[in-house]
Amino acid sequence: QNPHRADAVTAARIDGVTCQWYPSGLVSGKAREENFLPAVAHYSLPYDTQGKARIVYEFDAADINGSYMYPAMARSFREAGFQWATQFAYDPLAMATYNTDYQTHWMNLVYTPAKAVSLRIAAEAFRSLSRGEGYGHYPANSRFGDFRVSYREDLSLLNRDTLYCYSNTTEEVPVAPEKLRHIVGHGQSPVVKYNGSGAYFLDKMNDGSWRIEVYPDVVETMDAYGRRNALNRKVALIHSAFRQMQIILPGMEALFEVKPGVYQWHEGRLEEITAQAGFPALQDDVEETAVYHTPAVELLEGQAAVICAAVVSPEKVDSVVLYGEMQYGRAFTVRMYPESGFTYAAAIPGDL
């Protein structure tokens, strides 16, 4: 804020300096959809900080709902020689459903699972990447060490022999599936097929059993970064429901249904241990049946149009049917099929 005093500050007898980074700005009033990876390809230190501790307080990918930014920012911090970085800020569970604390930021494991997994990966990147090591320019530096980020896939990925983490569905195969001890996921992967929309954690115990922790499905009801957030209007809802999970690992192939909680898989048997595990009490937000849908901006003539919508209900959803009417009054009905979490999809034929 006072760049004309920077030389005097850095020349003083101080132990270190702090910096911050908001590459997408602050308080845009809406979610930012642009690709910001080029903007975080490098972090340029504008001042002479030789011989001083370098600390980041604070940083965030503000107003970005994607899950691809945090590891890239961690990479650039380490390249610039930073030794400490603090993300701003984590939303308490009771407030995350409203995002009223400071709406340009939104981070919570339950309500923003993809972003939370991305931050988990970024923490690992910051700890493991060498200070001062560069990885080239964008897009070549989208893969660095054990890590990969992708705007197109909305993905942060860590692929290591014992640790495999992904913020969204990926087809990238683990480098050593037989050695895996920890999996942190959101979406699906070659080793975990899951049709819920919450985060999950799989940890191999010393006795060979697996501890499985699963979080609720979540759906956004409005732009969480808007200027109208209030305590009487929830920007996201969570719901606990049984979902199918399939695990495909050497020595462990299993197919079962789980609801949010903690489980132990041992010798071919799944046991719920939520009560003993200290799992947080998560109250469902879904109180009535509702549909949340963002209309497509454009459709290609003659091609099938895929329509997606989130359908929530406190009761089990039996079926979802899309009713439509074309120009000049031609009506049609198309059945919608469940995908992950609350999402249902239908393809409208292009010849309608």
Where are the predicted features?
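C-terminal beta-strand-rich structural cap/linker in extracellular carbohydrate-active enzymes
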Residues: 245-285
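Non-catalytic scaffold segments within catalytic domains of secreted glycoside hydrolases
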Residues: 2-11, 21-32, 64-89
